[in-house]
């Protein structure tokens, strides 16, 4: 069924009846509402079949890197301002759940249908009734390189209330389409910092469903999960921001405002998926 949906999407795009890029004309610029809760609610999603430390390979244009849940758990240890949830799909495959549950505040087992977005969606449901707070959605593919980043990211968001979501890597186009020269800017979904208010607006604009929920086909999931969530933030009138080793860049759906390399940013760095402090 997912493959059929993907084919329909591709056909509609080819004839010009559907667009991944939701456009920028007519979008009214907005600013986020201030947070009311000082805690940062973090979700780390993991697949139960992964070892605690692993090597990540994408393709020949992107450097391989070391990553894993071990490094993500270490990243947030001893942070009194963080409430940490680990979500895991196919949890029956893991031999480490007993240890993991001692290193986080909450553990949620989820189906693998939707992959990361299955975990993100379940996590959102668990916190949706809270006061407005900062929310970080991330997974275990983040580079093992450690840095003290969170305070600088929160400070940046506080100073830049026009930013609805912040990431650490991005892409200027959709590769899962027949339209080759498309401009579809989006953050890559292994690290997304936002607020509960913005996330709630995103879900509402997506028909009450968390983007990517229930999708198994990886190409369709990138389109309706990773790309869709960024495009919804932009459609709401916020900007996106990305932190790389070269600094912070804001962007929207206007190609004239794009200042980053075209394509997948990870092809232009020797530290893909790394978190760099501001």
Task: Provide a role label for each language-model segment.
Residues 1-278:
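ER/Golgi luminal nucleotide-sugar-dependent glycosyltransferases, focusing on the catalytic module
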